[in-house]
Swiss-Prot record:
Function recorded in the entry: Promotes the release of prenylated target proteins from cellular membranes. Modulates the activity of prenylated or palmitoylated Ras family members by regulating their subcellular location. Required for normal ciliary targeting of farnesylated target proteins, such as INPP5E. Required for RAB28 localization to the cone cell outer segments in the retina. Modulates the subcellular location of target proteins by acting as a GTP specific dissociation inhibitor (GDI). Increases the affinity of ARL3 for GTP by several orders of magnitude.
UniProt name for this protein: Retinal rod rhodopsin-sensitive cGMP 3',5'-cyclic phosphodiesterase subunit delta
Disease note: Joubert syndrome 22: A disorder presenting with cerebellar ataxia, oculomotor apraxia, hypotonia, neonatal breathing abnormalities and psychomotor delay. Neuroradiologically, it is characterized by cerebellar vermian hypoplasia/aplasia, thickened and reoriented superior cerebellar peduncles, and an abnormally large interpeduncular fossa, giving the appearance of a molar tooth on transaxial slices (molar tooth sign). Additional variable features include retinal dystrophy, renal disease, liver fibrosis, and polydactyly.
InterPro entries: Ig_E-set, PDED_dom, PDED_dom_sf, Rhodop-sen_GMP-Pdiesterase_dsu
Keyword Membrane in record: yes
Gene Ontology MF, one: small GTPase binding
Assembly, per entry: Interacts with the prenylated catalytic subunits of PDE6, an oligomer composed of two catalytic chains (PDE6A and PDE6B) and two inhibitory chains (gamma); has no effect on enzyme activity but promotes the release of the prenylated enzyme from cell membrane. Interacts with prenylated GRK1 and GRK7. Interacts with prenylated Ras family members, including RAP2A and RAP2C. Interacts with prenylated RHEB and NRAS. Interacts with prenylated HRAS and KRAS. Interacts with RAB13 (prenylated form); dissociates RAB13 from membranes. Interacts with prenylated INPP5E.
Region (Required for association with membranes), start-end ranges: 144-150
Intracellular or extracellular location(s): Cytoplasm, Cytosol; Cytoplasmic vesicle membrane; Cytoplasm, Cytoskeleton, Cilium basal body
Keyword Manganese attached: no
Length: 150
C-alpha cells in the first residue's frame, strides 16, 4: 500500500458525517434532514426527499462532519446520475480542516432550469448522487446515494 493510500485510509477512518439537511434557500425551511453517515463507501445509501424540493430555485445544504485528521483542502465532487447517465456535476470546497474538529458546512445548490426538470415520478429511484471526498487531490472516499422523491 502506498503512502497516499495509507493517508486516505487514515482520513476516512477518522471521518464521520454526523448529520445533513436540505433547505429551501429562499425560505430557509428544512425540507429533509438525516443522521445516517452518507459518506460511508461500499454501500448504496438511500434518501427519501420530498418532491417539492424539485420546485426550489436553489437548495441550501448543511453538512456537519467530524474529522480526527487534519486536511489541507477538504472538498467534494458530486455527480448526479439518471439511469447511469451524468446529468449534472457540482464542485464544493471547504478548505482547511483542524484535526479532532467538528464542522458545519453550508453550500448553495442551484436548480437546473425548470424547462430541463423531469417530474418526480420519472426521477424517483432512478437518480444516484455520487460524492467523492478529497483532501486536495487525494481521493478519500466515494459514496453513492439513491434518491426517492416522496
Amino acid at each position: 500500500m502506498s503512502a497516499k493510500d495509507e493517508r486516505a485510509r487514515e482520513i476516512l477512518r477518522g471521518f464521520k458525517l454526523n448529520w445533513m439537511n436540505l433547505r429551501d434557500a429562499e425560505t430557509g425551511k428544512i425540507l429533509w434532514q438525516g443522521t445516517e453517515d452518507l459518506s460511508v463507501p461500499g454501500v448504496e445509501h438511500e434518501a427519501r426527499v420530498p418532491k417539492k424540493i424539485l420546485k426550489c430555485k436553489a437548495v441550501s445544504r448543511e453538512l456537519n462532519f467530524s474529522s480526527t485528521e487534519q486536511m489541507e483542502k477538504f472538498r467534494l465532487e458530486q455527480k448526479v446520475y439518471f439511469k447511469g447517465q451524468c446529468l449534472e456535476e457540482w464542485f464544493f470546497e471547504f478548505g482547511f480542516v483542524i484535526p479532532n474538529s467538528t464542522n458545519t458546512w453550508q453550500s448553495l445548490i442551484e436548480a437546473a432550469p425548470e424547462s430541463q426538470m423531469m417530474p418526480a415520478s420519472v426521477l424517483t429511484g432512478n437518480v444516484i448522487i455520487e460524492t467523492k471526498f478529497f483532501d486536495d487531490d487525494l481521493l478519500v472516499s466515494t459514496s453513492r446515494v439513491r434518491l426517492f422523491y416522496v
